[in-house]
A protein has these predicted regions:
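Short helix-capping/linker turns of helical repeat alpha-solenoids
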Residues: 3, 16-19, 32-34, 39, ...
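Hydrophobic face of amphipathic alpha-helices that form TPR/SEL1-like repeat modules
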Residues: 25-32, 59-68, 97-104, 131-140, ...
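Ankyrin-repeat and related helical/solenoid repeat scaffolds used for protein-protein interactions
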Residues: 204-205, 211, 217, 221, ...
Length: 365
């Protein structure tokens, strides 16, 4: 029968005898309050004893304490020092975290080459997280030349190792035929496997497939259920997608609520949707300045739809002074950018391009 108090008793005896793993386990108990009263000072003491004795797991845990400020003042440099030692001992999670620190410049000067080195070391040693990160770097050309063959290889290895993010990203590549021949059966399979592990991005992607009838029979009710589950886990894009379908169904107040929640989660398309509501006075009072602010926020997040709307606002003087010549130039630039954008599959995208074309034509004379 499980008994944390007995476990702590034996870990304590092992630690007193100099067993490094017992020290690390005892420290974990003190940190989490398992079988003993929580005591961060005691946890830090035993992590340090174990780490100084050469235990890679304790080195990782000590680094994590410095990173989080558990029992000690937060210190990223100390965290990196212990992650480095743990990584050199072959501890996989230390490799993961050290690579992350180099990638994002946390506690150490940003260095993509070193980040990639440790991701590769971790991946080759069996870390599914490092495999996923390596796949992501190859897919996006971060720190290495873009190579979709390598991306697929590492995503597949990570997904087969149980990494839900890799399952989703691999599914997305099969879904869109990027770096691999489009295969909706495989896409749906990977999305479903990731969703089973509560991956919100995969739930959202499944929702999109059901909404569009892509790889599965079109079923809006099932799509909305997947969106709902994803949104409950914090997936902002799922709230946006729910908002879109509610808007199409004429449930405008509900749509606005989901758009607002998605915008609060930094979904760029949600800012476009909110801007439209304010521009046209849908559910809310018509407010050109607020519409323009929404479009500006979405544009900063990368939304081409917001860029098109913002250019149109400047041309027509919505929410600010009208600037016909400069506005026309911005509209033409936005339209050219829109033609090449990866957002083309987004809801409402073609309608936005057509609106901008009409606006340009009406104001060129």
């Amino acid at each position: 029968e499980q008994n944390w108090q007995e476990a702590v008793k034996w870990y304590e005896q092992g630690a007193q005898c100099g067993d490094l793993q017992s020290m690390n386990n005892l420290a974990c108990c003190y940190e989490d309050g398992e079988g003993v009263e929580q005591n961060e000072d005691r946890a830090l003491y035993w992590y340090r004893r174990s780490a100084e004795g050469g235990n890679g797991g304790a080195m990782y845990n000590l680094g994590r304490c410095y990173k989080m400020g558990h029992g000690v003042e937060q210190n990223w440099q100390e965290a990196v020092k212990w992650y480095e030692q743990g990584a050199q001992c072959g501890h996989l999670q230390s490799m993961n975290n050290l690579a992350y620190c180099y990638e994002y410049g946390e506690g150490v000067e940003q260095n993509e080459e070193k980040a990639l080195y440790w991701y590769r070391r971790g991946a080759e040693a069996g870390s599914d997280y490092c495999m996923y990160c390596l796949g992501w770097n190859y897919s996006n050309g971060e720190g290495v030349e873009q190579n979709m063959t390598e991306a697929i290889r590492w995503y597949t290895a990570a997904a087969e190792g149980g990494n839900a993010d890799a399952m989703h990203d691999l599914g997305w590549l099969y879904d869109h035929g990027e770096g691999v021949e489009q295969d909706m059966k495989k896409a749906i399979c990977w999305y479903e496997r990731a969703a089973e592990q509560n991956c919100p991005a995969a739930m959202n992607s499944l929702g999109e497939c059901y909404a569009m009838g892509r790889g599965v029979p079109r079923d809006l009710e099932t799509a909305m259920e997947w969106y709902r589950r994803a949104a409950e886990l914090g997936e902002a894009m799922a709230d946006y997608n729910m908002g879109w379908h509610l808007e199409q169904a004429g449930k405008l107040s509900e749509a606005y609520a989901h758009y607002r929640k998605a915008a609060d989660g930094n979904d760029d398309s949600a800012w476009w949707a909110l801007g439209r509501f304010y521009e046209n006075g849908v559910v809310v009072a018509q407010d050109g300045k607020e519409a323009r602010r929404c479009y500006e926020t979405g544009e900063k997040l990368g939304s081409v739809k917001c860029k098109m709307r913002l250019a149109r606002c400047k041309l027509l003087g919505i929410g600010g002074r009208r600037a016909k010549k400069a506005g026309l130039d911005l509209c033409r630039q936005a339209l050219e950018l829109a033609k090449e954008s990866s957002e083309k599959e987004d809801y409402g995208y073609e309608a936005e391009m057509n609106l901008l074309r009409r606006t340009i034509a009406e104001n060129e004379s």
